[in-house]
Amino acid sequence: MTMKKLTSTTTTLWDNKLFINNLKNFMQTNTESNNNKTTAQEWKSFILVVVIALMIRILIIESFVVPTGSMKATILENDRIFGTKYSYGYSNYSLSFFDFIHLFKGRIFARTPERGDIIIFRPPHEMNTRYIKRLIGLPGDKVQLIDDVIYINDEKIERVESGIYVSEEGRKYLKFKETLPNGKTYFSYKLAPVLGIMFNDKYGNTDAFYVPEGEYFFLGDNRDQSNDSRIDLGFVPFENFIAKAQFIWFSTKITWWDSDIGVINLILKLKPWAESIRFNRIFRNLYSIED
C-alpha cells in the first residue's frame, strides 16, 4: 500500500509539473505570437501613415521654403508656404519624387491658371531648382513694361502709389497697388531712390514680349530684385508648374538648420531662431490686400 501511495503521489507531482511547463510554454508562445502580431500591425500602421502623407504631399498640398526676396514684401525670405498641387492638374514636374521619371507629357486634369496667381514652378534654365513668381502674361499676350508700368496687349494696367515699405534691413521701397485686367489686385515694390538715383531702372523699360502658346510670363513683386521673365527666366512652359501658392504657415527671420555647423552650434542657434519668428505672418493669405 505504501509503495502504491508513493508511486501515485510521484505520478501526480510529475503530471502537475508537466502541466505547469506546458502552460508556461503555451503562454510564452502565445505572448510571442501576440508580440509578433502587434509588431506587424504597428509596421502596417506606420507604412499606411507614410503612404497617406506622401500621397497628400504629391497630390494635394506641399510646403515650400522661400530662400530669396524676389517676391518681397508679399513673400519674405524664410517664409514657409503651402501650395496646392491640384490647382493646375499634374505633370512630371509637379509630382514630387517622380520628376526624374518621364511618365507622361504635358499635364493631366489641367486647369487654366489666371493672371495674378502666385505660382511655384521649375525654371527652364535651372530645372533642378524652384522659383516662385506672380503670373502676368498668358499664352498669346503681348507684355511690356514702360516706366515701370505693365502693359498687357497694349493696355496699361492700373498702378497707384501706396506709400513706403521699409524692409527688416531698413531699406526703403516705393509701394504700388496694381490691378490686372481680370480685377486681381496686389502690391509691387520698387527700390526707393537714394540721392535721386534709381536702381536697376533698365528693368522698368523693356521690349515687347510675345508669350508663345503653352507658355507664361512671370514677374516678381520686388521689381528691381527679381530674376523673372524680363531677364534670364524667359517664358515658362505650363508643364513646369508645380503648385499654386496659397498662404504662409510659418516664418522666421533667420534659418536654424545648417548641416555644416555641428550640433552644439545648432543648440546655441535655437534661441535666436525662436526669437526671430514672425508671428504676424503666420497663416497669412497671399491674396489678401493689407495696406
UniProtKB/Swiss-Prot annotation:
What is the predominant subcellular site recorded for this chain?
membrane
Q: What is the lineage of its organism?
A: Bacteria, Pseudomonadati, Pseudomonadota, Alphaproteobacteria, Rickettsiales
The organism encoding this protein is Rickettsia bellii (strain RML369-C)
Active site positions, chain numbering = S70, K133
**Superkingdom:** Bacteria
UniProt family annotation: Belongs to the peptidase S26 family.
Transport found in the keyword field: no
Q: Mind naming one GO cellular-component term on file for this protein?
A: plasma membrane
What molecular function terms (GO) are annotated for this protein?
serine-type endopeptidase activity
The cysteines joined by S-S bonds are none
In this UniProt entry, which residues form the Periplasmic topological domain(s)?
67-291
GO BP annotations listed: signal peptide processing
Compartments annotated for it: namely: Cell inner membrane
Mode of membrane association: Single-pass type II membrane protein
What reaction does this catalyse?
Cleavage of hydrophobic, N-terminal signal or leader sequences from secreted and periplasmic proteins
Q: Which PROSITE patterns match?
A: SPASE_I_2 (PS00760), SPASE_I_3 (PS00761)
- Which EC class, in a word? hydrolase
Mapped to this chain, the residue ranges on the Cytoplasmic side of the membrane are: 1-45
Q: Which UniProt keywords apply?
A: Cell inner membrane, Cell membrane, Hydrolase, Membrane, Transmembrane, Transmembrane helix
For this entry, the protein name equals Signal peptidase I
Q: Where are the transmembrane segments?
A: 46-66
NCBIfam families in the record: sigpep_I_bact
Q: Does the keyword Cell inner membrane apply?
A: yes
Provide the E.C. number(s) assigned to this enzyme. Answer: 3.4.21.89
